[in-house]
Amino acid sequence: MEARAIAKFVRIAPRKVKIVVDLVRGKQVDEALAILKHTPKGASPVVIKLIQSAVANAENNHEMDREQLFVSEVYANQGPTMKRFRPRAMGRATTIRKRTSHIGIVVKEK
């Protein structure tokens, strides 16, 4: 049995989120939360909240034991890119791409 949680349209670039999610893939849930708590990255609080949501889904919806849960799948896919423009010299403008992510976590029992 598995439980999942998904955060969509998170305003962090997927390249930056992938660095954080690679740290917790395959880890026990409590160990993953401890690792993320001490990781100084902007995506860490988002992934912590997502793991807590997946654990709550497992406990409440599927009656799983928290001690047996581990992170079986975790992914950070690219969402839509918001395009903004920055004025530059001589009447030009450059595009600023504000990237978003879709982050998903699946927890399973051992």
Swiss-Prot record:
Pfam family, one: Ribosomal_L22
Gene Ontology biological process terms, A to Z: translation
PROSITE patterns cross-referenced by the UniProt entry: RIBOSOMAL_L22
GO molecular function, one term: rRNA binding
GO cellular component: cytosolic large ribosomal subunit
Keywords tagged on the record: Ribonucleoprotein, Ribosomal protein, RNA-binding, rRNA-binding
Family stated for the protein in its record: Belongs to the universal ribosomal protein uL22 family.
HAMAP family: Ribosomal_uL22_B
Protein purpose: This protein binds specifically to 23S rRNA; its binding is stimulated by other ribosomal proteins, e.g. L4, L17, and L20. It is important during the early stages of 50S assembly. It makes multiple contacts with different domains of the 23S rRNA in the assembled 50S subunit and ribosome. The globular domain of the protein is located near the polypeptide exit tunnel on the outside of the subunit, while an extended beta-hairpin is found that lines the wall of the exit tunnel in the center of the 70S ribosome.
Subunit structure: Part of the 50S ribosomal subunit.
Xref: NCBIfam families: rplV_bact
Protein name: Large ribosomal subunit protein uL22
Organism: Alkaliphilus metalliredigens (strain QYMF)
